[in-house]
Amino acid sequence: MQIDKKCYAGHVAPFVVWVGVIFLLQGLEWAGLCPRALYPWSYAAKTVICAGLFVWLKPWRIYPALKVSNVPLALLAGVVVAVVWIVPEMPWLGRVAPGVQEFYHRWCIMMPGAYPSYYNPSFYPALPSGHVSLSYAPQEAGWGLTIMKLIGSACVIAVVEEFFFRGFFYRWLRSAKFWTVRLASFDMQAFWIVVAVFGLEHDRWLAGMFAGVVYGWLTVRTGDIWAAALAHGLTNLLLAVYVIASGQYGFW
């Protein structure tokens, strides 16, 4: 029973706390009680808390270490997902194929049928004045909180999500004692359920599903949870660097 509790807690608790903070902010925003400064500060706080939970609960104890032979494939997967995530929203695509970019923003980002709040085709990629995503920019939050956003995205939530979705959820759909299911064993139904849930967890649901396919395939292909975490972390790192360099804080 003790092993069961530790396995569940280590895989689930950090993710639940992370998502819980998101829902809390949404509730405060709906009630008009969420000052702009709370967004970057809450992100920094949940980064520290969830990293601490992960280290304390040690869910990695039931997995072997990252295999060096899996690193090249993981890095390639991370780059591919980053490219697919970023390119549809790059300014040059709006100049070359504005209809394609408008379609992507209208139908491939939550909620389908309406433009996301950060997108206005008349002055994109600039954000609407005072948009909440700008609260993460160093000009407003300071470099410390902007870097914490990068660290949390690339080093904390990427790992937490992989341990939850690929380490726990994918196998739990097949057995309550999920740790007894081999990561490398493929189950079609479980795979696509995880892809769908993972995609819908993100506002960019189509890119999220593509990422779910790639990270899920990598996990099954290698049987290595750390390969998926490395790929996911690299994707988020590349995205964060692009956001800061380009000023497209709508991604955040």
Regions found by a protein language model. Name each.
Residues 1-5:
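Short, Lys/Arg-rich, polar N-terminal cytosolic tail immediately upstream
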Residues 63-157, 171-183, 249:
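Juxtamembrane helix-loop-helix connectors linking adjacent transmembrane helices
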Residues 7-83, 99-107:
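Alpha-helical transmembrane segments in multi-pass membrane proteins
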Residues 21-24, 87-104, 201-210, 214:
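Alpha-helical transmembrane segments and their membrane-interface junctions
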